[in-house]
Amino acid sequence: MKSLYSNVLVLDSGARGSLTTFVQRGIGDVLISWENEAHLALQETAKNQNVEIVFPSVSILAEPSVAVVTKNAEKHNTLKVAENYLKFLYSPEGQETIAKNYYRPTDKKVASKYKNTFKNLKLFTIRDVAGSWKNAQEKHFSDGAIFDQITSKQ
């Protein structure tokens, strides 16, 4: 990993910044990205660059968390709106919107409609490989952990 990392020209702070650096600034030969960002890159470069998405056979299932913070929603008198939004996300219509924006839908019927967009991958979770998000954070990103070891200049 350290050898691979030594070839990184720009390390942006997030996925969208990395996408911009790769697509708009033309820096780098490979972009390792979230699936939705890869599809956006393909869409953005379709007319002027030769970009291809390479799907691994195994990948991590990264699901953004969604929740209603009841106390905050009640304070702002938006509890019903927040609850309805959450319900919408898991409705067929919401899942369709999710898929159109290149996020993997969990609704099987919607997923089958987008099977050409979302390749069949063996997906694992953080719990599968680290036991918990806390364990993964400590192992990979705490001071002196794997990320620090990979990125150190020594």
Predicted segments, located by residue:
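Solvent-exposed, acidic/flexible segments
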Residues: 11-12, 31, 56-59, 75-82, ...
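Extracellular/periplasmic juxtamembrane helices and adjacent flexible linkers that interface
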Residues: 72-154
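Solvent-exposed loop/turn segments at secondary-structure junctions
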Residues: 36-40, 58-61, 72-74, 104
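A generic structural signal for short, solvent-exposed coil/turn residues
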Residues: 45-46, 58-60, 115-118
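Small-molecule pocket liners
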Residues: 62-66
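Ligand-binding pocket segment of bilobal, Venus flytrap-like solute-binding proteins
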Residues: 1-56
